[in-house]
Amino acid sequence: MFFRVLLTECLKLKRTLALWMVLVSPLVIVLIEFAVSAKGAHVAIEAGKDVWPPMVRTTIEAWTMLMMPMFVTLETSLLAGLENTGKNWKSLLALPAPRWTIYVSKLIITISLLWAAHSVLIVATIGSGRLLKSIYPSLSLGSMPLSPFVVPMLRVSASALLAVVIQHWVSLRWHSYTVAMGFGMCAMIMGIFAVQSKVLGAWFPWSLPIRAVLDGVSGQDRITVVAVVGAILTATIGCWGFVRREIG
C-alpha cells in the first residue's frame, strides 16, 4: 500500500514546477559561478592558479547558504499545494491507505528532489568547468577531481534533512502557501546569521548544512548526526500529529 501511495505522489509531479525546479535551481548557481570564473579567467591564467578548488567551494557555499533553503521552501510548498489548491485533502484522506503513508511519501519525494538537484549541481559544475577549459585552453583546472565536490555535497545532503523535515511539516500543517513561504524565508535569513556563530550554527537546522562544510572533521560528523537524528525524531512527531489531526 505504501509503495502504491508513493507511486501516486510521484505521478502527480508530472509537468509540475516542482519537477522543473530540480533543473532550474542548481543551473542558476552554476551559470552565475561560470560567469564569475570566466570574468576572472585572464587573471587566473596570469597567476597560474588552479581555479577548480575555488570554483567548487564557492558553488557549494552559494547553493548551501542561499539557493538550497529557497529550493526546499518552494518544493515543500508546491507539493503541499497539489492538495491545498483543489482542496483535495478530504478526498485524499478518505482513501483506504493509512494516513502516515501520505505524509511519509511526500517527505520522501521532497528529499529525493533535493538530492536530485544536488546531482544536477555536480554534473552541471563539471560541465561548466570543461566548457571554461575549452574557451580558455590556458586556464588551469587540474584534473577536476570529484572528491572535493562530492564528499562535501554528501554531507550537505545529510545535514539538510532536519530543515527539510521541519519545512515539510509546516507546509502540511498550515494550508497556506504564504505561511510556508514566509516561514522558509525567515528561517533562511536566521540561518545566514546563525552560521556566523559556531555555537548557534551547530544547532540551528538551517545552518547545519553550511557548518557541515566549514567545520573540521569532528564537527562535520557531529553535525551530520544531529541533523539525521533530529530529522528522524521530527518526522516521527510530525507524522504522528498528521495522523491524529482533523484535516479539511
Question: Which residues does each predicted region cover?
Answer:
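Aromatic- and glycine-rich beta-strand/loop motifs that create alpha-glucan
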Residues: M1-P26
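Transmembrane helix-loop junction
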Residues: L82, L95, R130, S134, ...
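Terminal transmembrane helical anchor/hairpin motif
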Residues: A35-R57, E61, M181-G248
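Secretory targeting signals
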Residues: L27-L74, V104-H168, L172-W174, V213-G216, ...
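Transmembrane helix boundary and interhelical loop/hinge segments in multi-pass membrane proteins
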Residues: L74-S91
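Alpha-helix N-cap/helix-start motif at helix boundaries, enriched for small hydrophobics
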Residues: T101-V104, F242
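Short helix-to-coil transition segments within interhelical loops
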Residues: L93-R99
